[in-house]
Every structure is written in structure tokens, then in C-alpha cells.
């Protein structure tokens, strides 16, 4: 597995704003979309291109377009939805495959409760999105599911990653590349990333009054 920490100044700036304890739901949601878009730029920079001709204002012009596999974006519900709009702003033609994964707060293990994959997903590049890579159990479960469906080219984008989660994915799926805005320090005893962002799902959806 390859972990790519994207330290672009715009990403560092926006991530710093997201770490504020008093950030509003609106601002957190907007920043999650913006950082998601910036990560998408990095995660797709090696996509193959092909040349074709069009009629321009001055005659025939050779231009380029993305070639090869089509893309499906795979948000891990629910928090992954918070990055989806930003990702689709750059690749609007991508199909969306939703995967629902819940984590047991006592055991920190994940179980899949929803699987809505696009047809012929085995012929697509699958790009998983989830704000937090904490224990790695949700990410591993999602990759397991995608590989079972026949996916061979899988990438993941997360806002923040813990070393423990990175290690878990690397052990289970060394072929998957992860793009992240930050590799943070560690997990606490409750499985939350330190310093992290808090509960990204609650902050995106406004389900806790203190984050509203």
C-alpha cells in the first residue's frame, strides 16, 4: 500500500479551519467538500489520456480526454456523503456506489449494512471516500466488499488518517493507495483520531447541538 499525504498549502489551511472546536455545521460541511475536491485532483493526476480531434474556431484542433476505466465514487455512509459533492465537482460523470458500514463503539469492529454498487463495477476505477481513517475497520470492510464484486483498481481518499488505520489497511490490502490531507498522531482509547476532527459525521450532518 502507498499512503500519500497531500501537504498542499490550500489543503493545510482548510484542514486547520476544520480542526476548530467551535466550527459550525455549515462551515465544516463546506470545507469537507473543498478538501475532498483538492484530494481528488491529486488522486486522479495519473489517469491516462488519449488524443482526439475536434472542430475549433480556427479549424481542426487536437485535444485530450481521460481514457481507460470509468470511475465510480464510493462514499462510506454516512460521513462519506460529506465529501461527495466536492469529488463530483471535478468528475461529474462518475457513477456513485454507496456502502453503509457501522462501527461497534465497544469492539471498534465494523459491519456492512448497505451495499448499492453500480453495474459492471469490476470494470471501473473505484474511489472510496470517508473523512476519517481511524481503526481502519470500515475501510478494510469496504475494500473487501469491492474486491468481492470484482474491483481491481481501488483508491481511497480521507481527510485525516491515524497510523493504526493506515497499518490495518496496509496489512489487509497492500495494493490500495490512500490519499489523505493529514497523517495524525494516534487513536485514543475510544478509537478517535488525535488531534483529528472530532466526529466528522455529526459535524457534517449537525446531529449534535454543540457542533451546530
UniProtKB/Swiss-Prot annotation:
What Enzyme Commission number(s) appear in the record? 2.4.2.9
Q: Which Pfam families match?
A: UPRTase (PF14681)
Any one Gene Ontology MF annotation carried by this entry is: GTP binding
NCBIfam families per the record?
PRK00129.1, upp
Enzyme kind, highest EC tier? transferase
The yes or no answer to whether the keyword Oxidoreductase is present is: no
Q: Which gene encodes it?
A: upp
Q: Return the protein name.
A: Uracil phosphoribosyltransferase
Catalytic reaction list? UMP + diphosphate = 5-phospho-alpha-D-ribose 1-diphosphate + uracil
Binding positions (5-phospho-alpha-D-ribose 1-diphosphate): 78, 103, 130-138, 199
Record's keyword terms, sorted: Allosteric enzyme, Glycosyltransferase, GTP-binding, Magnesium, Nucleotide-binding, Transferase
User: What is the native source organism of this protein?
Assistant: Pseudomonas fluorescens (strain Pf0-1)
Query: Any note on cofactor binding?
Result: Binds 1 Mg(2+) ion per subunit. The magnesium is bound as Mg-PRPP.
